[in-house]
């Protein structure tokens, strides 16, 4: 006798086939400590999503909060102060953004919450999850446990996940997309820390790697630009922003990432120290093992975590988190805002810039050896990677001995600004070098990629048959 599933299988297959042909609305959500960003897409199963609108509220930790709203690539609201509405948490910001989307007559596809089929949440630390995960109550509780590994990173996202699970229609599926999942291919000898392995396993202590959603996008965009299959691409990718990392990608898969157990390891950032001698923090302050005043009942943050994550980086060196201010100070003629700086202040800016360049180049050299010189491209991405032509030029000059560069000045300074937009994901800023590396003689290209984590999450959802129901 056939079981119920066998009897209804043709009907289930027919329903799934019909569902695959229907356009659905996918919402990508990226929650940070001071901002929340959502992007709405129309998608068919197995096809690239089409963006309908994008909205962001910034300034949650530095009021007043401001709203930015874009429809079909055109700015509708540009950093307008949010008034007459409570905005004290990420969940509050999310509610306002969804309402703005629903109230926009220019996006008729979304007239109510019921029109949203999927919500993709960027979760920084996914532990041992190796692919996006449909969020059930059990999954949510597992993600809560990961807060111990990433209290400063996962908690903001889970606030919105909880709001969606309680307030959005039951027909809306919540999907967790993890920044760490791209790096599950890092080999054991690279991801393992040389500590007692029984303790390491019991406490999940190993390198995880992060910025993986961005690196997945960068890898696909670079492969398309080079006219290669993803599985044939070897690149050294740099995601450079207020949080920065480097990644060695071999055959389209992560071989190594500069971040580790948490995003703190590796490159310095706006407020992160990056990798330092582990004993440094114990000499820095006497209370590093105590809980930070920023801790709450459910969120335990040590003073050490607070110092190295929130009170370090180039802010500690210069007093600013804005890398653009640092680079402008090195070329006073380019900005009136830095002309008042004293020679001592300019020297601090120079030190921060030089430290960042040196650390980046150290990873490029290390990863070049890991890839045995078989590197298709060095790829810059992230806010700083996309915007700072001075940084790109300095890095390329220092790694020119490996066969990268020389920089095309016009491409680096002008074309990137003018052409790197939604229609151009990748711009080449140095011609293929005649010096070829590795046993297979690959040409070393230098590229700038406009990464898009929001799109990457929506794409992953649209291509996964498990979610498309």
Curated annotation (Swiss-Prot):
Keywords: ATP-binding, Kinase, Magnesium, Metal-binding, Nucleotide-binding, Transferase. One of its GO terms (molecular function) is magnesium ion binding. Substrate binds at residue 122. The lineage of its organism: Eukaryota, Fungi, Dikarya, Ascomycota, Pezizomycotina. Belongs to the acetokinase family. Pathway: Metabolic intermediate biosynthesis; acetyl-CoA biosynthesis; acetyl-CoA from acetate: step 1/2. It holds the Pfam family Acetate_kinase. This is Probable acetate kinase. Its EC number is 2.7.2.1. The active site is at 179 (proton donor/acceptor). GO terms for biological process: acetate metabolic process; acetyl-CoA biosynthetic process. It catalyses: acetate + ATP = acetyl phosphate + ADP. HAMAP family: Acetate_kinase. The record marks 211, 272 as: Transition state stabilizer. ATP binds at residues 37, 239-243. Its cofactor is Mg(2+). It is an enzyme of class 2 (transferase). Mg(2+) binds at residues 30, 453.
């Amino acid at each position: 006798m056939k079981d119920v599933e066998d009897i209804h299988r043709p009907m289930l297959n027919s329903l799934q086939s019909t569902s695959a042909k229907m356009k659905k609305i996918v919402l990508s959500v990226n929650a940070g400590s001071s901002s929340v960003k959502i992007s709405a897409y129309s998608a068919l199963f197995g096809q690239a999503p089409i963006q309908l609108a994008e909205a962001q509220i910034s300034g949650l930790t530095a009021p007043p909060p401001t709203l930015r709203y874009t429809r079909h690539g055109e700015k509708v609201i540009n950093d307008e102060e949010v008034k007459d509405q409570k905005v004290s948490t990420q969940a509050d910001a999310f509610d306002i953004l969804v309402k703005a989307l629903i109230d926009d007559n220019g996006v008729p596809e979304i007239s109510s919450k019921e029109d949203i089929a999927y919500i993709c949440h960027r979760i920084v630390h996914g532990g041992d999850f190796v692919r996006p995960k449909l969020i059930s109550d059990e999954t949510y509780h597992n993600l809560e446990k990961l807060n111990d590994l990433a209290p400063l990173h996962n908690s903001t996202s889970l606030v919105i996940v909880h709001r969606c699970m309680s307030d959005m229609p039951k027909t809306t599926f919540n999907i967790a997309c993890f920044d760490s999942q791209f790096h599950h291919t890092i080999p054991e000898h690279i991801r393992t820390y040389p500590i007692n392995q029984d303790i390491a396993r019991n406490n999940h202590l190993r390198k995880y790697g992060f910025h993986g959603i961005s690196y997945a996008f960068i890898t696909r965009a670079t492969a398309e630009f080079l006219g290669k299959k993803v599985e044939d691409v070897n690149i050294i990718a740099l995601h450079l922003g207020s949080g920065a990392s480097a990644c060695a990608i071999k055959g389209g898969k992560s071989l190594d990432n500069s971040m580790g157990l948490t995003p703190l390891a590796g490159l310095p950032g706006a407020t992160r120290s990056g990798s330092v001698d582990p004993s440094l923090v114990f000499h820095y302050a006497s209370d590093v093992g105590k809980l930070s005043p920023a801790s709450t009942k459910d969120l335990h943050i040590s003073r050490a975590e607070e110092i190295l994550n929130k009170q370090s980086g180039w802010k500690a060196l210069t007093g600013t988190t804005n890398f653009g201010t640092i680079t402008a100070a090195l070329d006073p003629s380019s900005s009136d805002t830095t002309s008042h700086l004293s020679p001592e202040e300019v020297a601090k800016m120079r030190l921060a810039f030089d430290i960042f360049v040196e650390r980046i180049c150290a990873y490029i050299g290390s990863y070049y050896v890991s890839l045995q010189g078989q590197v298709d491209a060095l790829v810059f991405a992230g806010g700083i990677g996309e915007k700072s032509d001075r940084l790109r030029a300095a890095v390329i000059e220092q790694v020119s001995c490996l066969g990268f560069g020389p920089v095309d000045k016009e491409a680096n300074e002008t074309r990137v600004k003018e052409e790197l937009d939604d229609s151009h994901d990748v711009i080449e800023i140095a011609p293929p070098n005649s010096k070829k590396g590795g046993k297979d003689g690959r040409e070393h290209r230098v590229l700038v990629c406009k990464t898009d984590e929001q799109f990457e999450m929506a794409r992953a959802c649209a291509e996964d048959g498990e979610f498309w129901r």
